[in-house]
Amino acid sequence: MRYAELQVTTHFSFLRAASSAEELFATARLMGIEALGVVDRNSLAGIVRALEASRATGLRLVVGCRLDLQDGMSILVYPTDRAAYSRLTRLLTLGKGRGGKANCIIHFDDVALYAEGLIGILVPDLADEVCAVQLRKIAEVFGDRAYVSLCLRRRPNDQLQLHELTNLAVKHRVKTIVTNDVLFHEHGRRQLQDVVTCIRTGMTIDDVGFERERHADRYLKPPEEMARLFPAYPEALARTMEIVERCRFSLEELVYQYPEEALILGMTAQQSLQHYTWEGVRARYPEGLPTHVEKTIRHELALIETMKYAPYFLTVFSIVRYARSQGILCQGRGSAANSAVCYVLGITSIDPETNDLLFERFVSQERDEPPDIDVDFEHERREEVIQWIYKTYGHDKAALCSTVTRYRAKGAIRDVGKALDLPEDLIRTLSSGIWSWSETVGERQVRELGLNPDDRRLTLTLRLAQQLMGAPRNLSQHPGGFVLTHDRLDDLVPIEPATMADRQVIEWDKDDIEALKFLKVDVLALGMLTCMAKAFALISEHKHEDIDLATIPQEDPATYAMIRKADTLGTFQIESRAQMSMLPRMKPRTFYDLVIQVAIVRPGPIQGDMVHPYLRRREGKEKVEYPTPELEAVLHKTLGVPLFQESAMRVAMVCAGFTGGEADQLRKSMATFKFTGGVSRFKDKLVNGMIRNGYTKEFAEKTFSQLEGFGSYGFPESHAASFALIAYASNYIKCYFPDVFCAALLNSQPMGFYAPAQIVRDAREHGVEVRPICINRSRWDCMLEPIDGSGGHAVRLGMRLVRGLATADAARIVAARADEPFTSVDDMWRRSGVPVASLVELAEADAFLPSLSLERRDALWAIKALRDEPLPLFTAAADREARAIAEQEEPEVELRQMTDGQNVVEDYSHTGLTLREHPLRFMRDDLAKRRIVTCAQAMTAHDGQWLMAAGLVLVRQRPGSAKGVMFITIEDETGIANIVVWPKLFERSRRVVLGASMMAINGRIQREGEVVHLVAQQLFDLSADLSSLAERDGAFRPPTGRGDEFAHGSPGSADSRGKAPPGVRARDILVPDLHIDTLKIKSRNFQ
């Protein structure tokens, strides 16, 4: 018999189902089910994934949605045509607008207003009077499109319920239809279904009760089984196919229309684009346009006209022009940097005159996919650009894409463990043993953690957590991907308010809109642009030089000399340990060397085995040979090694006769070959084409395997060049203005790879004087102060580094001392009006010492005498005398001051850094007795020497391309050391590697040129020694840099559901009309 399952919930109903659309469609196809109706709850978030699963299996998708109404009524709705679909998306947008983030409030009256063209299936609970009222309503609204679901609930008298429900349906002239209310694709997912129910409801498996499914029957069943279960209702079974026939709407009917962007009255979008392009040519090439660049621009304009992309280019041009008019630094990157048109419009900075661009990497007629222009803005000012877009295009036509937050290993173990009621300390132990968000925990790791692998709940937790990994947890907003439309955006997709004010998000992510060929504009944030903007402002103010990204001197020898020494901490892109290790081997001397440097430390070139051949050829250890002049023309700049995606495309075009579009299809298939196997269809064409052009079969196959090896991670040359521009500029500032660079970098946190402690240490090593936070001299930001008699400048640390201090309180302090500095704690308190709690934060940061000579404990003792509301009698007297009076002053008390070690611990605890001695300086004698050398001694030791070094753990990295090798950076009072931990040692010492804040390493020095590593053989946790530094109960954990993948998550994969790491507390905002001085803030006791 023919049957379609029309009530299928995927895991995009977020913790209400346990299977993906891919699993459901694949299973349904094997069972002979003809179509699936996907009805996620109050959402279309997973419908595009269902469309792709439908395309992959050839099974029909019926687009639908389950509406859970406020009165308790539930209706399955399916649009029969395009107009009905738009009414559904508008209805969902209405409900989400009322409900706010992750909620949807819809009433039956709303459904009645939007019901035209929708098929409605009532999902009843019992055949009672409530059901009768609901049937009457649905019959009135939906007419002949009204149905009622017959579904086995596995409760007493199920068959009697079905019989009575059928009678009620006949009475109200509503047709019956059989559904199975599918929540998972196969019986084995039942336990996971119960667990996600527990997670959603916040209960454990022991007390969830009737919230869980009462039976294990919510899986897909073949048509024959459904006929056996509903023998008395053959018509209701047959009607499933009736609804499939009536619902002819497909998501592929959605026609995306980009906003019309003419900009110039009387001109079309294409004419406007051409006008601005040739206007930009005059600005970019004042001495005349080179012939080959003109040819490139005309080629691009013609292709843009053919593809009808002119409005898109004009939109990005408008956004960039607005940002520049507001003094906001921005730069385009990615494949868009292959466009000469983007360059002359000022969107990108890669000059086609000096760079060999490949436009087909960006826009290809054969590919027929929308272009993707990524533009980076200062991360502190990007919100101005976002709000301008909303204001310009309207909230009804502009919204951000969503991002799907999925379960990774840590989050899965945490949530499943709570659902199964594991003890919190056991969950914490399991989670702490995981390196990355995607790593699994097996029996071996369980034993290493000292746990019992035979414990049933523990074993079940690990198994179910493995099943949960990859499942969607919730939707969040994309970093900056805007979808803009000509007509109403909610005609295409539901829109919901974002958590942030004045933002809204569509329910689809970037992969969904790409599948439907929607255009998006990426308005991204880049911290280094904020840093550069602040650096330029400081240089102008204090050095009286006006420079910007465009006027920084190019190919500066001193800058490249600094880069070759790997003196790049804090700079852009080349500050990681892997990049620093490569710099002395690459020895960049030109801008193109820097482009290669940015791209070469990537998984693609490493997995394609291209790094070592390139380095050997660069060092003259291997001869560069080109079989033909054509190949030499393509690869001569990279010494015969195809390091970039454009290189692979040009090899295919020049050596195998591919067109530009075919070469881009090859690139894209290489990027997905691991998942689809699509690259194999190009192998014969590439190999045979190269053989026809005179290459040997062996060389052709080697070329293909090389391209295949790196294709999935290949880096576009244009993207590398865009990043190299900023990398060079940041290094130039560091080279010539190290004081400015330090201040700007600290003022732009959080960003980059390293914590403020390492940034300050590096600046001091470059001769920069760094001055402490001071209540009379520090502003919110770090500033430059003149050094008497030298003409130089020192960096004064700003109050932004004081943990817990509010921005508004800092502003009041600065304003209050404008006329004269504070003379005492009481004077500061009275004049600034900040709450006592803020004074405590400043005292704990030792901010009273520089100008008032008050040690921490003295300042805290003085603050303890203050009240947020002074006694009225004393206040009046003090105001009259314009000074503190004797009755307000505390008697002098001599306190025992903190030790140097205690002060260092307090510095780290309250500012994240110290200007005193390094913590290990206090431990050096003890370490020396154990024959532990300094980091400086270790890094200058000869090759092969065995030694033991120790230091604070700054960074732990385990790149996916490094085959499990761990790279650790440690620091002591003499500098840093780079540690290599092989996979076997990592597994043996996992708890030390992941848990130690201070570590000792016994190993052997490995020296290759200027690159030095300590290859670990044994690891020891010295965190207890570090904690004893302050002789206190709490463990002292110095802050790690943002590049530490264990403390801060794997790059790009942070688990957003985890608790925020300890650090700077949320700051408030200074609102002039908010009389914050009237708020009562309880002061804190210091004991």
Swiss-Prot record:
GO molecular-function term, one example from the UniProt record: DNA-directed DNA polymerase activity
CDD domains assigned: DnaE_OBF, PHP_PolIIIA_DnaE2
Location of the region described as Disordered in the Swiss-Prot/TrEMBL record: 1033-1064
Chief location of this protein within or outside the cell: cytoplasm
GO annotation terms (biological process): DNA repair; DNA replication; SOS response
SMART domains, sorted: POLIIIAc
Cellular component GO terms held in the UniProt record: cytoplasm
Leading EC class: transferase
Reactions this protein catalyses: DNA(n) + a 2'-deoxyribonucleoside 5'-triphosphate = DNA(n+1) + diphosphate
EC number of the protein: 2.7.7.7
Superkingdom of source: Bacteria
Alphabetical UniProt keywords: Cytoplasm, DNA damage, DNA repair, DNA replication, DNA-directed DNA polymerase, Nucleotidyltransferase, Plasmid, Transferase
Location of this chain's protein in the cell: Cytoplasm
Function: DNA polymerase involved in damage-induced mutagenesis and translesion synthesis (TLS). It is not the major replicative DNA polymerase.
Protein family per UniProt: Belongs to the DNA polymerase type-C family. DnaE2 subfamily.
Official protein name in the record: Error-prone DNA polymerase 2
